[in-house]
């Protein structure tokens, strides 16, 4: 929780191996509860089945393609995972790649629609590589950062 709380005013969250939301800081909680996602909910289910989430993301096709690649990468890293594979298969049936893999940008920001404004955030994801506790080893920490000045200013004003 220390890392998540210190990341305010920007969103930060922790998810488990199957993308269930385990913890979130104040900014992430505000962002996610606005689209119906709460602690304990599956971010995979939200990405696959929530019109509220999809409609709140301006660049959903780009983000969906990024999620698809991420799911396949995580499953391969784990030596195969039926839950991640099923989610990737479902998403692959719905999403057409927006660009060839060779031309994908290094960072795909997620652009959220928040009323009349658009908040553009990019993420870094960290995982504990030397954890002795398997539950801790399965946690991924996602720290979101503003991708533009407007987004930075909105988060600073809300939490300042």
What positions do the PLM features span?
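PAS-family sensory domains
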Residues: 2-3, 8-97, 114
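Amphipathic alpha-helical interface segments
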Residues: 74-75, 79, 93-160
